[in-house]
Swiss-Prot record:
PROSITE patterns: RIBOSOMAL_S6E
Species annotation: Yarrowia lipolytica (strain CLIB 122 / E 150)
Name of this chain's protein: Small ribosomal subunit protein eS6
Biased composition (Basic and acidic residues): 219-229
Chain segments carrying region Disordered: 219-242
Similarity annotation: Belongs to the eukaryotic ribosomal protein eS6 family.
GO biological process: translation
Keywords: Phosphoprotein, Ribonucleoprotein, Ribosomal protein
């Protein structure tokens, strides 16, 4: 079984081929997301704690979180499911996936170092791979450099050097997202003003309608009163004639 070990703290990754199956038996019957003490792998892993993140079996089928089974199963998967990428809107497909319980059928097991042990592992904890890209969002840049809201974020953007095929070198920086600029503030103020105007116009229209409705109701009442008066006078005239 191959063991794909990642160390996110230093951005390194290493694949170790373990031919003796007895050495990896400590992972059997464990589930994805479970943390395992890795002392059984050898002296170099003494004190290390590894978290199981996934794996593939010998036919290449991936492990799926939430499927409580040590073997392969066929599931009807949709757009939001892991282990499946839908090509069309609303498409679903029955796919073979492996359960989240580790068994001897796996060819590759992916783990992450949660706690470092006593000894260093060559090529994993001894090296540091810097991140290729820095943060892009304004708040994340502020958090990285401990900036206040008054500081200009644009001066702290992490730039990287890019070399073209012709050998020319230039620096490249990401476009800062969610950056508060005078233009953005003016746009927000404009939208707010438009909203206030719309609310006021709606209130004015409602008041005008209520006034018109009251006028119509009053007119109808007066018409009814006039009709009633006319009828009463005509009845009085008829009774006098009789």
């Amino acid at each position: 079984m191959k063991l794909n070990i990642a160390y996110p703290a230093q951005g390194t990754q290493k694949c170790i081929d373990i031919e003796d199956e007895h050495r990896v038996r400590g992972f059997y019957e464990k589930r994805m997301g479970q943390e395992v003490e890795a002392d059984f792998l050898g002296d170099e892993f003494k004190g290390y704690v590894l978290k199981i993140t996934g794996g593939n079996d010998k036919q290449g089928f991936p492990m799926k979180q939430g499927v409580m089974h040590p073997t392969r199963v066929r599931l009807l998967l949709s757009k939001d499911s892991s282990c499946y990428r839908s090509r069309r809107a609303g498409e679903r497909k029955r796919k073979s996936v492996r359960g989240c319980i580790v068994s001897s059928d796996l060819s590759v097991l992916s783990v992450v170092i949660v706690k470092q042990g006593d000894a260093d592992i060559e090529g994993l904890t001894t090296e540091t791979v810097p991140r290729r890209l820095g943060p892009k969002r304004a708040n994340n840049i502020r958090k990285l450099f401990a900036l206040s809201k008054e500081d200009d974020v644009r001066q702290y953007v992490i730039r990287r050097e890019v070399t073209t095929k012709s050998g020319k070198t230039y620096t490249k920086a990401p476009k800062i997202q969610r950056l508060i600029t005078p233009r953005r503030l003016a746009h927000k103020a404009q939208l707010r003003e438009k909203k206030v105007k719309a609310i006021q116009a709606s209130k004015d229209a409602a008041a005008e309608y209520a006034q018109l409705l009251a006028k119509r109701v009053a007119e109808k009442k007066s018409e009814k009163a006039e009709e009633k008066k006319r009828r009463a006078s005509s009845l009085r005239t008829q009774s006098v004639q009789a």
